[in-house]
Every structure is written in structure tokens, then in C-alpha cells.
Amino acid sequence: VNASSGSSDGGLREVHVLVMTVVHHPEDARILHRQIRALVDAGHEVTYAAPYTARGVMARSWVNGVDLPRAAERKRFAAVRAARKVFKRMRGEVDLVVIHDPELLLAVVGVRKRPPVVWDVHEDTPATLSLKPWLPAFLRPPVRFLARLLEGAAERHLHLLLAETAYAGRFRHAHLVVPNETWVPDEVTPPGDDRVVYLGWLSGARGVREAIEVARLLQPYRVAVELIGYADPQSRPTLNEAVAEGVLEWRDFMPNDEALKRLDGALAGLSLLHDEPNYRHSMPTKIVEYMAHGIPVITTPSPRAVELVERYDSGVVVPWQDPKAVAQAVLFLRDDVRERYARGARGYAAARANHHWPNSARRFVAQLEAWAGVKS
């Protein structure tokens, strides 16, 4: 279905954008629910190439879906080759291409007569590579070095968008920051007293073991722990075991719009990241999402998380890898209704004022229109 309603507003030409990912889930909140949605709402047409079959989902009706293989662990080249084919086939039909994975730099390099290409930098690529369990330790330093070279080349030949201000230091020039904000609802329900939630990717480095331990500690107090998100292969067996024992609820992957509804009325939202290089500079999106839904945040002390929670007094900061402290924070918020309501309300007000996606969406769309050669 073409999302075209574009040229009615006084000469602004409709842009056709090709968006590609082989790493992210097709329902990724940043890619689909924020960026693509903003382009479609502005009257542009989007073809979205992503691993639909591999992830067991259908393309939304408001994009043209193209199926790609998923780049999983070491099987990345087949996915990159497939993306390169799509890119070559469509290069004459689209005005602009947006790629979301460093791997896809290899899909666009050296293709002649290509439209402008935008790389949306989601993470600290060199630091992230040191976290990949499938990459042997001896390969990590040379791969990190190659990643830096690749980033330098990308900056010379492509347009860049950054998900974090903190990533700017890796590049020579200034680039537009499109922050990981969220849709902040017009009103929210006050936080309840019997359920804590975790929303996001689940892995060891993101605190999956601590979350399970917290659930065990809270069982006698009848506070349920609900995890929502895709888990990496290393964590799945442990999670399945915990679910079988009745320790917690794990809802696996849910589309972002459905997952966010699960935050309403929770007692608190958890962010249990470990102290890893990739997490030091990035703003955990889930914290903004918890605040946007009016629930207090319980987070480990990664610098950006502390900055948010302490600035707005919207939750509790707990030590690294300390399930007992997390459980105590949950019980403190459960027992002190005034404090729970106040922290939830302050977080909501701050999110509404400072982290509401439509405010950034306008800048994002205008920048893409400019790169596609359209005057808005």
C-alpha cells in the first residue's frame, strides 16, 4: 500500500525512501514506529526491506515490504548480499536510502549511480563488537579497528544521523542527532502496586539473570515481574526455565505499540544494564518509555540513566548487578504510595516536555527531504 498523500501541500514533492535493515527486528521502535511512521505521516512513500520471514512478522500496510534474510551471528554475508541486490534493483526508483546496520555499509559501497544514502548510527559500533559472544576474543581488536575505518569512510561518502549526542566524538563533522524518544501519551494511569516490568532486548549484559533473581526475591511479597522483549540465544533456556517454575512472566517480542500498553499501571520499570563500554554513552530508551507511561524507574548507574533519573527525580538508582537492592527499591515504592505516584508523575511531566518524539520527528523529516533534494 503506498502511503502517498504528498504533493497536495503547495508543491512539496513526495519522496520515495528505501529503508533497509538485516540486523534489527522489522518492528523495531526507532526504525518503524518513529522514523518510518514520521515519513509516512508527512506524505512520503516508504519501501521497507527487513527480515520479515526470519522474524515471523508481516510488513505493515502503510509500507511496501521487501523480505531480506536476517544477519544472525556469523551468517552475515548472505544477508548483506541480498540487501545489495535489493539496493541495486531499486536505486533508480527511490530518492533516498536509509540503512540502519553497519553491515549494510558493505551493501552500498561501490554501487554506481546510487541515490543519496543515509546511515542511521544506532550504537557505538566498535564498542558493541567487543560484546558479541560469537566474535572470538583474538579478533576483537582488529575488528574494532576495521569498524573505526569503516565509520571514517562512511562519513566521507554518506549522510549520517546519530542516535546519541555522545556518538558525535567518533566523527569529524557535526551530524543531526535523532534521539531515541518515544510517543508520550496525553494522559497516563497512576502506577499500581503488584507488577514490575522490563521492556527491551534481553541478554546477560542487559541484566537478564538479575531480573530472574529479583522475581524470585519478590515472589513472597506477591509482586509479579513481567519481561517483554526478544532474548538472545544464550538467555532463552534460563528464561524458559524461570517461566516453567512460575517465577516470572516473559512475553517475548511484542510490537512496540502493544508492548508500551503493558507499561500502564505497573509499579515500576526496570533497566538493569551492566557496566559495558557500549552502554556508557547511550541513553537507555526504556527509561524514557517508562517515564512516558508515568511509572517510576529502577536503574543501574549507567551515566546517562543516572543523569535522567536524578535530574527529574523519577525513580531509584541501584548498584550494578545487585538483585537484592532492586527488590528493596521495588518494595520501597510499593509501600510508599505518595513517593511512587510523585516519581511517576515527575517522570511523565519531564518526558512530555523533553522527550516527546513528534518534536524531533519534524527535524528528522525535514533533513531527509533536504537530502533527497526536496525543498520543504
Question: What are the functions of these language-model segments?
Answer:
Residues 17-18, 188-216, 225-226:
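Conserved donor-binding/catalytic core segment of Leloir-type glycosyltransferases
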Residues 30, 206, 255-262, 269-291, ...:
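Nucleotide-sugar-dependent
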Residues 261, 338-369:
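A charged, aromatic-enriched C-terminal amphipathic alpha-helix characteristic of glycosyltransferases
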Residues 37, 84-91, 106, 119, ...:
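Membrane-proximal helix-turn-helix segments that form the acceptor-binding/catalytic region
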Residues 311-312, 316-323, 332-337:
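Conserved acidic donor-binding segment of nucleotide-sugar-dependent glycosyltransferases
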Residues 54, 224-237, 252:
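Glycosyltransferase donor-sugar binding loop
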